[in-house]
């Protein structure tokens, strides 16, 4: 939390938590702390905190844990219906959004459709907002075109265009390639990633880590 407050938006944090380390509790606590994090000017640092699991069905344990931290109406919204529900939550700036990675490929079209219905054309204010993205099991969920859509939805059209170009040239796009492209162009100023994994691969460390190392490590011995 101290680092996120000091460094501001646009950084990656790899959290290596071994099995039995209470990862769901840590993610729940982090989501709520990030959603209420304020700058020195007393402004909210993140407009929304998006908690993503790579499971097709929302992780019930993780979902319940997050709900336990705050029962107030409208603070936490689980996306268990369709992608339109997710798009509406992003547009509304719901403080904490819980969803699966599989829903993101459809969000771009839904956001544009809702903007048109309101007479706003095809421009969405999503890329101008600031997001904290918490990824559960980063090593398994961050690959393919679904992750590319996540970056495009929250990062804007320019990043999505770059991802599409890579997809055309190389077929299936892995997030590692996309992050390398982002690194060359600078970090995305409106997104901070908090990636949780028990078994970080070399590429995961290279992309999310700090100098190839996790930002925080809770080992099996400590657990």
Locate each region found by the language model:
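RecA-like P-loop NTPase motor core of helicase/translocase proteins
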Residues: 1-223
């Amino acid at each position: 939390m101290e680092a996120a407050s000091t460094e501001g938006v646009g950084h990656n944090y790899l959290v290596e938590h071994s099995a039995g380390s209470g990862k769901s509790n840590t993610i729940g606590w982090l989501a709520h702390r990030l959603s209420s994090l304020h700058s020195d000017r007393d402004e909210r640092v993140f407009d929304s905190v998006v908690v993503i699991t790579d499971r097709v069905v929302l992780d019930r344990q993780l979902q319940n844990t997050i709900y336990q931290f705050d029962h107030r109406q409208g603070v936490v919204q689980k996306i268990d219906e369709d992608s339109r529900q997710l798009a509406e939550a992003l547009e509304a700036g719901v403080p904490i959004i819980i969803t699966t990675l599989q829903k993101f490929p459809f969000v771009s079209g839904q956001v544009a459709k809702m903007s048109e219905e309101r007479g706003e054309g095809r421009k969405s204010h999503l890329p101008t907002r600031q997001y904290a993205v918490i990824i559960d099991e980063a090593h398994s969920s961050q690959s393919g075109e679904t992750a590319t859509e996540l970056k495009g939805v929250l990062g804007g059209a320019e990043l999505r265009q770059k991802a599409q170009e890579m997809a055309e040239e190389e077929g299936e796009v892995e997030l590692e390639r996309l992050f390398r492209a982002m690194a060359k162009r600078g970090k995305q100023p409106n997104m901070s990633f908090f990636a949780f994994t028990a078994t970080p691969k070399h590429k995961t460390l290279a992309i999310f880590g700090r100098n190839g190392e996790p930002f925080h490590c809770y080992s099996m011995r400590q657990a």
